[in-house]
């Protein structure tokens, strides 16, 4: 076991691929777990929904619970008009959730602990919301940069402030997710290392404490996917509903 709790976030190359110009596109452990997450989501949806029944199987029940959650979140934040974007929000939620949970498993790797991954997901949300905003509202979408009732003399400053806040959305989304995943996994690693070094691994108290921490980390993994999804729906509301 590595003594450094941050080594679990180290990206390592599984096999090399030809570079594209100056860009390295080697297949890494991060690539593996993103592919694995996508595969598990696709397989679960296929198997769970292949034979829908009145009395759902456990996998179908989980998928339906997630789907109902996405629908209710969109309806409460965006309205009925936002239901056309259920596939987008469902994909984002399930991908983040599965990536978070895979990182908790032994020998797992938490891809959402890397800002490059979380920023890429956040940029997908940012670009999609911006496109949807202009699709629904046209140039009226730019009114988001100027709150209603703003005095004319204050308008230029408010536009700059709101533009900065709008462009900062993907940054705040990505940092929030990555920081929380790093913090949770690091704490578990530190405490587990302390328990092993003190040779008290087989005593009940530290084992129970680690189990509680892992349970808490599962809760955090679900919570962070939930927060990311809710914020995505809030941003969708700005794009779909006129101000």
Curated annotation (Swiss-Prot):
Transmembrane segments annotated in the record for this chain: 29-49, 54-74, 89-109, 114-134, 141-161, 177-197, 200-220, 221-241
GO cellular component, one term: plasma membrane
Keyword Transport: yes
Subcellular localization: Cell inner membrane
Topology term for the membrane: Multi-pass membrane protein
Gene Ontology molecular function: proton-transporting ATP synthase activity, rotational mechanism
Cell inner membrane is among the record's keywords: yes
Subunit (UniProt): F-type ATPases have 2 components, CF(1) - the catalytic core - and CF(0) - the membrane proton channel. CF(1) has five subunits: alpha(3), beta(3), gamma(1), delta(1), epsilon(1). CF(0) has three main subunits: a(1), b(2) and c(9-12). The alpha and beta chains form an alternating ring which encloses part of the gamma chain. CF(1) is attached to CF(0) by a central stalk formed by the gamma and epsilon chains, while a peripheral stalk is formed by the delta and b chains.
Entry similarity comment: Belongs to the ATPase A chain family.
PANTHER family per the UniProt record, alphabetical: ATP SYNTHASE SUBUNIT A (PTHR11410:SF0)
Protein name from the UniProt record: ATP synthase subunit a
Organism per entry: Ehrlichia ruminantium (strain Gardel)
